[in-house]
Regions:
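Conserved P-loop NTPase mechanochemical-coupling segment
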Residues: 9-18, 108, 112-160, 188-193
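Structural recognition of the conserved hydrophobic beta-strand(s) that form the central parallel beta-sheet
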Residues: 179-183, 207, 220-227
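Walker A/P-loop-proximal flanking segment of P-loop NTPase domains
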Residues: 1-80
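P-loop NTPase motor core
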Residues: 61-126
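Domain-level recognition of nuclease-like catalytic cores that cleave nucleotide substrates
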Residues: 539, 543-567
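Extended alpha-helical interface modules used as scaffolds for assembling large macromolecular complexes
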Residues: 242, 294-535, 560-567
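Amphipathic alpha-helical segments of the small helical/lid subdomains adjacent to P-loop NTPase cores
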Residues: 232-237, 245-304, 341, 346
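Substrate-engagement module of ASCE P-loop NTPases
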Residues: 121, 162-173, 200-220, 536-539
Length: 567
């Protein structure tokens, strides 16, 4: 039996993956497409964890002088012998990943950027011994190795011209223009916005990119990647022959993320074909250009788990690899209309929106419409069908992302409940005192505020679980009792048992879903019969609690009916 290749979980270095013989999904067609389409500066925007860094590493390995050409043996690009002969290993390459450029202050972030650039410059120490560089040029190189410790204006100038200078020195040495690869170009802007120095970072990046990409006679071409397409006016002012390829573009639509065929092949290679449906439900659903795309981070992680443990279940790998503050901000800002639209999304329906692909970070929170756009570009939403008149039909792509929305909706509702002390107190006192009108009134108010996650096609049991979660969220905020959920009692499981501080008192609650408002009364009757027939009060009586109230609560959409009986 052929030994299975190791899966590259967490590996983003192409050379490392190939030399260690890890499994590699061939994306080398990207090289061919770049050279055929030819733009001086190319920006690819895709959600995080969609293979951007690995693709950039692959480009570096292909073009850089001195590359090991055997890395590409057997891959798609090796079939194009003429292209490989002309371009493989023929260029100096500058490769920067800006994902680590962060700091609580602008000075800290700038220092991180200086060290990053200096670290890349140190790869070219052979320039110090180059016969093609004169004394002054070698001194310029020495300055670039250490960009720190200068006066403010000197440091700013050196940093601004650093990439242009090193590409000029590389040209002097090789007689060949430089390829510049900048991965995660927008991370410093995102961090700067979060920490309050956005304008300073925009000015820094604009200056650096302007010199490296716009007025650089020693540039062959550049490739940048990021999550957001920051508006050209803020960063890329004046760049000619500048192309942006977003998730909406047909060109390069299969080069980031896995296609259906690639996922099938991967599962076949590990004899896991039977898991295809669940992989598709959980990790597919992204529509890039004309292609249906899976999140590669998820697929690789899940296959790796299955190889280790055959009974592994799908997990939210992509979601757990970063925070999900964006969805939280979106829900926090939602008005009644937006809450209704979120309900549509969560139950699998589409919402039509006009999307802006060129926002700046400081515009994101200006309006709920801008957040719709960012949710699309960052992968929390995807398009369903063709774009018509600038309007996108947006859907949640898969089960994994739906889990994020559900989690954030629950957290948001918990916060709503925690902040409304008067209503929760009224509900809780109502349960203790048998005041069904108070309970019904306040519960209906909360139901009106919440975001329903109920699919109309869901089974009654699933709908009851939803309302059960809402009621538990309200009851657990009251310190006056212990809340027991789905506890075995008598001949079955009671939905909710409440044990107040008074040791003589106990409360049993049974929930039912009604298909129409006319059925609420009958649903309450069924709930009450179930409490009695299955002796749900047994656990409470065993505790010595004999002053018992039983509640039957029926729900229909955002209305409810409450009845009570003394047991």
């Amino acid at each position: 039996m052929q030994e299975l290749k190791k899966l590259p979980v967490g590996f983003e270095n192409f050379q490392e993956i190939r030399k260690l013989d890890f499994y590699y999904v061939d994306k080398t067609k990207l090289v061919e497409q770049l050279l055929e389409n030819w733009s001086k500066v190319n920006l690819f925007t895709r959600p995080r964890r969609f293979g951007k860094t690995l693709n950039m590493s692959m480009l570096k390995s292909f073009f850089e002088i001195g590359t090991d050409t055997a890395l590409f043996d057997g891959l798609y690009i090796s079939q194009n012998e003429e292209l490989c002969k002309e371009y493989m290993g023929k260029y100096p390459v500058i490769f920067l990943s800006l994902k680590g450029v962060d700091g609580l202050t602008f000075e800290e972030a700038r220092s991180a950027l200086c060290e990053l650039i200096a670290g890349e410059v140190r790869r070219f120490k052979f320039l110090l011994n180059s016969s093609r560089l004169d004394h002054d040029e070698k001194n310029i190189y020495r300055d670039l190795i250490s960009l720190q410790g200068e006066q403010e204006t000197t440091l700013a100038t050196k940093l601004k011209f650093s990439l242009k200078k090193i590409s000029e020195l590389l040209y002097q040495h090789y007689g060949q223009k430089t390829i510049v690869l900048i991965d995660e170009y927008d991370v410093p802007l995102d961090k700067a916005f979060q920490h309050g120095y956005y304008r300073e970072m925009v000015a820094l990046i604009r200056g650096l990119f302007g010199e490296a990409l716009k007025t650089n006679d020693f540039l062959q071409f550049a490739v940048l990647t990021g999550c957001l397409r920051v508006s050209k006016e803020s960063i890329f002012t004046g760049l000619n022959n500048f192309k942006v390829y977003s998730a909406d573009d047909v060109r390069y639509d299969e080069e980031f993320g896995f296609t259906n065929e690639e996922v099938k092949k991967l599962l076949e290679d590990y004899n896991l074909q039977k898991h295809f449906t669940e992989v598709k439900e959980w990790y597919d659903g992204y529509r890039f250009g004309n292609a249906d795309i899976y999140c590669p981070w998820d697929v690789i992680n899940y296959v790796d788990d299955l190889v280790s443990e055959a009974k592994s279940q799908p997990k939210a790998y992509w979601i757990n690899s970063s925070g999900n503050d964006l969805v939280k901000r979106f829900i926090d800002m939602a008005d009644k209309t937006t809450k209704d639209e979120i309900e549509q999304l969560v139950v699998g329906e589409a919402v039509e929106k006009r999307i802006r692909l060129d926002l700046t970070y400081d515009e994101i929170d200006n309006s709920i419409d801008n957040l719709w756009s960012v949710l699309f570009t960052t992968g929390y939403l995807t398009k369903n069908g063709d774009v018509e008149n600038g309007m996108y039909r947006l859907i949640i792509p898969n089960k994994e992302v739906r889990e994020v929305f559900l989690l954030q909706i629950r957290d948001w509702f918990d916060q709503v409940v925690a902040n409304d002390h008067a209503s929760t107190e009224k509900i809780n006192r109502g349960f203790l005192e048998g005041k069904t009108d108070d309970i019904q009134q306040e519960l209906t108010m909360f139901l009106g505020e919440t975001i329903s996650v109920l699919d109309t096609k869901a089974r009654n049991e699933e709908k009851e679980i939803f309302y059960h979660g809402i009621l538990i969220g309200i009851l657990k905020n009251y310190s006056g009792w212990a809340v027991k959920s789905n506890r075995e009692s008598g001949d079955g499981y009671a939905d909710i048992l409440l044990k107040p501080k008074n040791p003589d008192v106990g409360i049993v609650i049974e929930l039912k879903y009604a298909h129409s408002m006319n059925e609420l009364d009958k649903a309450c009757e069924r709930a009450m019969e179930q409490i009695k027939n299955h002796r749900y009060d047994a656990e409470l009586r065993e505790d010595g609690r004999n002053d018992l109230l039983a509640y039957g609560i029926a729900f229909c959409k955002k209305r409810c009916k409450v009845v009570v009986e003394k047991l």
